[in-house]
Amino acid sequence: MTVRSSPGSASPATLRRSLAAFAALAATLLCGAGETSSHDVVVYGGTSGGVTAAVAAARMGQSVVLIEPGRHLGGLTSGGLGATDIGKKESIGGLSREFYQRVKRHYANPAAWKYGRPDEFRSNQHDPKEDVMFYFEPHVAEKIYVDLLREARVEVVRGERLDLKSGVAKHGTQVDAITMESGRRFRGRVFIDASYEGDLMAKAGVRYLVGRESNATFGETHNGNQPYLLRRQKVASAHDFRRAVDPYVRPGDPTSGLIFGVQPGGPGPEGEGDHRVQAYCFRLCLTNVPENRVPFTRPADYDPAKYELVARYLNSAQMLPEFPTAGDIEHPVLGNNLTRPEPVVIMPNRKSDSNNKDPVGFNLIAGNYDYPDADHATRERIVREHVSWQQGLIWFFVSDPRVPEKYRAPMKDWGYPKDEFTDTGHWPHQLYVREARRLHGALVMTQRHCDGTLPVTDSIGMGGYAMDSHNVRRYVDENGHVRTEGTIGLGVRQAYRIGYDAITPRREQCTNLLVPVCLSATHVAYGSIRMEPVFMILGHSAGVAAAQAIAQRAAVQAIDRAQLRAALLQQGQVLERPAR
């Protein structure tokens, strides 16, 4: 774990820094270096949580601007993650539930089923009797978000990225304005950082965390380095090697170096904190409808040598000792177990939501360590590397003779949908940033809050998904085999409360900023909270809190918590477990 604070942070105890920040703002204004607009609430990041934050504040009568650095709204929810990771359904309320109700209404129209019929759609998460629908196509999700923002009369600004060098102007503990790379400036009374990266939070001088804490830091059991967790439990995880794979360029020869995708170093001390971040990938939308299918093609930078690890795993016949009956390998691209003619997750209109499968799937493990604190150019490079890895993996399964025929043959029936991501070559517009920066606030949500052993006051929403982390690295074990490390799948017994102080910075650091996406949580707890329905819940609550801070002329930390609770309940938020 790394605890960080932006070098230029302003503090109420440091008059010189406060005056410097104010002077910088004044100088910039005098120079006329870009258009300036003023709003009550400024939301940075058009993620699912950013949309609900903006809509909630606008519905409370505030003037709101939503700034999205890219061209699309909805983040992962409109970027391929159509098979919602739900957790406890009963904990989803407010604008989050309204979104899924609108999905249900969309598919209630027979005209929505262009490439299939409603009775063909099957999912263990879909109950036709419910008022919500949790599986949907990406373009449908984005249209719903656009409609919500238009109806609430939120000003939406796309294609504007925060200036990471001098883009946040503070006076004391208050953010006065934020400036984009173009020079465009936005003044506000309350700011909400709803980005996956937490750039506004970091550049406002707010303390934050990156990586994994040690177990000892917050009294947890599943944080930090976990090389023996699955082996000790003998759990045949979909993300762990179950067959023996040699890691060396020349098999058996450590002097020849490691093949692509294996990191140096052995198991390491168990439970020790580090800088590592769980792996990212793109959630792909694929289809097997011929008239709507764009065939897979060979990427220009395709390098078959990068997939030697995949080839060795697919062709290994030696089971590792703790997994003697692990069964067949799931298809790393299509995600099925080869007994089905289609991916596990089928969406409306014969589309898929294809996530990482197996220890050598879509995740570019260890390719994201620099992402959380990187500048825009470095992040763009990291995104390109993820695209390259994933598109190359697809072509490897289409074309490489090292791929057994039972894995190659199904690929001919699948491709990208013509009617999705039409302005990005049918490739998702959003990388799955599973975890980046995390606020270090007065309340840090931990494993013990999620499992119910520590109480949480001032609830602003509920979580209910398992504490889930993807792998952070591959290493060579004591027997010379490749292993993965970092997977966590720690279930929660029941829905748990998320406290208001987890989305507010410490008061001495910033008093008009809310952070509902990169909220204050340990690596383990964030693994549960980081689900898209919860981001929408927390965004909604942040929007209401922002409006109340303005109405009460109070710091976001000092608003009347009883009034916040009353407003959230009136708006349909679920703040407690339903009575049995």
Regions found by a protein language model. Give the residues of each.
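N-terminal secretory signal peptides that target proteins for export/translocation
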Residues: 1-15
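Bacterial N-terminal signal peptides
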Residues: 18-29
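Bacterial Sec-dependent signal peptides at the C-terminal "C-region" and cleavage site
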Residues: 27-38
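Beta1/beta-strand and adjacent pyrophosphate-binding region of the FAD-binding site
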Residues: 37-47
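N-terminal Rossmann-fold NAD(P) dinucleotide-binding loop
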Residues: 50
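Conserved N-terminal/central alpha/beta ligand/cofactor-binding core
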Residues: 62-63, 68-169, 209, 217-219
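Flavin (FAD/FMN)-binding glycine-rich loop and adjacent Rossmann-like elements that form
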Residues: 142, 184-190, 194-579
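Conserved beta-strand-loop-beta-strand element in the redox core of flavoprotein oxidoreductases
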Residues: 167-185
